[in-house]
């Protein structure tokens, strides 16, 4: 007679074993209809699963994050159901969930076309709208293998042979005549899987191994209702419009080419944005009392062996040889900073030492993972390392957190998710040290009034870390900032300081990055602003243009006044209609268009309009120079009149 305890603390007693769905029915028909699955003592279970002992139960519906994931997983099975009907000889591999959707890897003797995808999506919807029940059956390992042998499914057999113990009882999910194998849980009925779309087809090696056969991977998205699906597709459309690769080309910011994969060729306007970001961060480095240093691009293999990178990171490192010595081009700045710290005797009175670098790093990322500025091989880190005592951890982390939020807010990012990653199973150091480190990070977050999610066991082997993820205007998350405690590297590289008792001690090192990669951050803000950079970041802050040739000299005089004030302004005195010039520079997203006609010459003024088409009227040249200088100095996000 199981007693079921519900989330509100109430209890229900049953005379016999009871399913998750039956418990929901005992509460109410509305809840039963909405039930997708349940959490039994915290473990996700199918709605049909029986509970025979006392347990805590939470009902999972489409409103839950888990519910949405289950819908997506079941929609992957729906895809399998449909494709087996359309292509009976297809071999099914794996179909997991991913962010915002799912995919299924298939082995088919021909490439799928867009017409095939459209037909497949139509068949999926036809099947889903019959609202058939999904039946779960636990069977013996041998029965499962026999089932897939009879259906000529070699990939399912391989999963059984390689991943499932012979004394296990795998779950088979029956979608009418289609059978799939999965840990589950899955929806009890296909009425939950009506809102989906197939997105694209790509290639994928079986087991992710390039030695294996190339399969076709069908990607899809699935949501709980029609509005969620429509909103997501709208966000994708907006993301396509804001794609930093398209905008970068349209605004002539940078380019990339086959001869240098993953490397950026910065054009003048893109490099202007890059340098403005560096200048801004440098002002913050001074404000927060950092030293700026510069380490070498490559160092001897011996050093990388001492740090552990050669053993654990070699696949991502570019190497070269000279005079019978092997070198690695640095993938990160930290070993070089320890070398700088090691020059000269350090006392506890010298700590903390905050060392920052705009370090040019290189990582041999797989070519298939490269993506514009978001994933590159050559990048610049706004990296810093703080050498401190254990007693200084909390105060230094607090300072880092303040700096992170200070910088992000300047760009308009205020929706920030914080995660605290704690000790992994394999780690160095005593538990007492980890207790102190994790508590120091947690205290710093609490003292700053920050809510955070704990990621158990996700810290590095050498220390816990804080991660900062930005949410952008399209509801996407970008993991940028990190604060990482490191108890290993200073010791590996013999970093010491003289403590108050005259003993030699190893400092704690705090790795700190805010923008992360400057290249990637430019990609992020390009999409956030859709190329409409605020005036302080815009490569050209204003264009001064004439109406007729008679105003050309006045235009040059105005440009000189702005340039002497340190502003990025250029003249457009081409023999073109002023409307044509305005349209052209509007497409270039130049913040301000300054028009000079005969009237403006007489009054020593300029007519000002914004790239959004707002007519701001006329200003004296001196007046608008000061307005623009103030916008740049304050790093304002909006233009005048917006």
Swiss-Prot record:
The UniProt GO MF terms for this protein read: ATP binding; metal ion binding; threonine-tRNA ligase activity; tRNA binding
What is the scientific name of the source organism?
Answer: Histophilus somni (strain 2336)
Name of the gene: thrS
Family the entry assigns: Belongs to the class-II aminoacyl-tRNA synthetase family.
Q: What is this protein called?
A: Threonine--tRNA ligase
Residues binding Zn(2+):
334, 385, 511
Entry-linked SMART domains? tRNA_SAD
Task: Report if keyword rRNA-binding is assigned.
Answer: no
The record's CDD domains line, in alphabetical order, gives:
TGS_ThrRS, ThrRS_anticodon, ThrRS_core
EC number(s): the record gives 6.1.1.3
Q: Which residues form the TGS domain?
A: 1-61
What assembly does the database describe for this protein?
Answer: Homodimer.
């Amino acid at each position: 007679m199981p007693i079921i305890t519900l989330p509100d603390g109430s209890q229900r007693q049953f005379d016999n074993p009871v399913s998750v769905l039956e418990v929901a029915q005992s509460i109410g028909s509305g809840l039963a209809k909405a039930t997708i699955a349940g959490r039994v003592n915290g473990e996700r279970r199918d709605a049909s699963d029986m509970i025979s002992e006392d347990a805590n139960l939470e009902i999972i519906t489409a409103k839950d994050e888990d519910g949405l994931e289950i819908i997506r997983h079941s929609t992957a099975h729906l895809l399998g159901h449909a494709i087996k009907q359309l292509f009976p000889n297809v071999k099914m591999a794996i179909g997991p969930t991913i962010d915002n959707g799912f995919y299924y890897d298939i082995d088919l003797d021909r490439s799928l076309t867009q017409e095939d995808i459209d037909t497949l999506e139509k068949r999926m919807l036809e099947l889903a709208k019959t609202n058939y029940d999904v039946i779960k059956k636990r069977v013996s390992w041998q029965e499962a293998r026999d089932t897939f042998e009879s259906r000529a499914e070699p990939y399912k057999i391989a999963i059984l042979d390689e991943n499932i113990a012979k004394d296990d009882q795998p779950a088979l999910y029956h979608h009418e005549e289609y059978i799939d194998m999965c840990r589950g849980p899955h929806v009890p009925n296909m009425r939950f899987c009506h809102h989906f779309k197939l997105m694209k087809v790509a290639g994928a090696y079986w087991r992710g191994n390039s030695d294996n056969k190339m399969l076709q991977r069908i990607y899809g998205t699935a949501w709980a209702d029609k509005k969620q699906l429509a909103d997501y597709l709208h966000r994708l459309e907006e993301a396509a419009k804001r794609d930093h690769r398209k905008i970068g080309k349209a605004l002539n910011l940078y380019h990339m080419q086959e001869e240098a994969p993953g490397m950026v060729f910065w054009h003048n306007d893109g490099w202007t944005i890059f340098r403005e970001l560096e200048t801004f961060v440098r002002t913050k480095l001074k404000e927060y009392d950092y030293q700026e240093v510069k380490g070498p691009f490559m160092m001897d293999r011996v050093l990388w062996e001492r740090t552990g990178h050669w053993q654990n990171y070699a696949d991502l490192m570019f190497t070269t040889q000279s005079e019978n010595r092997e070198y690695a081009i640095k993938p990160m700045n930290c070993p070089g900073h320890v070398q700088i710290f090691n020059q000269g005797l350090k006392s506890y009175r010298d700590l903390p030492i905050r060392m920052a670098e705009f370090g040019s790093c290189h990582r041999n990322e797989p070519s298939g993972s490269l993506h514009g500025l978001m994933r590159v091989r050559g990048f610049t880190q706004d990296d810093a390392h703080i050498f401190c005592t254990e007693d200084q951890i909390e105060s230094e982390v607090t300072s880092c957190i303040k700096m992170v939020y200070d910088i992000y807010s300047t760009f308009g990012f205020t929706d920030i998710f914080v995660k605290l990653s704690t000790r992994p199973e394999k780690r160095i150091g005593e538990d007492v040290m980890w207790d102190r480190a994790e508590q120091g990070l947690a205290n710093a977050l609490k003292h700053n009034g920050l809510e955070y999610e704990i990621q158990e066991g996700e810290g590095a082997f050498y220390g816990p870390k804080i991660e900062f993820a930005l949410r952008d205007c399209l509801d996407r998350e970008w993991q940028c900032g990190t604060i990482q405690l490191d108890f290993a590297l200073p010791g590996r590289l013999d970093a010491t300081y003289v403590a108050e008792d005259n003993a030699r001690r190893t400092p704690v090192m705090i790795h700190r990055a805010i923008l992360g990669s400057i290249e990637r951050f430019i990609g992020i803000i390009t999409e956030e602003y859709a190329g409409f950079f605020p005036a302080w970041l815009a490569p050209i802050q204003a264009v001064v243009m004439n109406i007729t040739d008679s105003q050309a000299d006045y235009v040059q005089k105005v440009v000189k006044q702005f340039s002497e004030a340190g502003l990025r302004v250029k003249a457009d005195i081409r023999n073109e209609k002023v409307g044509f010039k305005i349209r052209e520079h509007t497409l270039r997203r130049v913040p301000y268009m300054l028009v000079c006609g005969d009237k403006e010459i007489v009054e020593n003024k300029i007519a000002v309009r914004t790239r959004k088409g707002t007519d701001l009227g006329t200003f004296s040249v001196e007046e608008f120079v000061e307005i623009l200088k103030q916008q740049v100095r304050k790093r304002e996000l909006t233009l005048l009149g917006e």
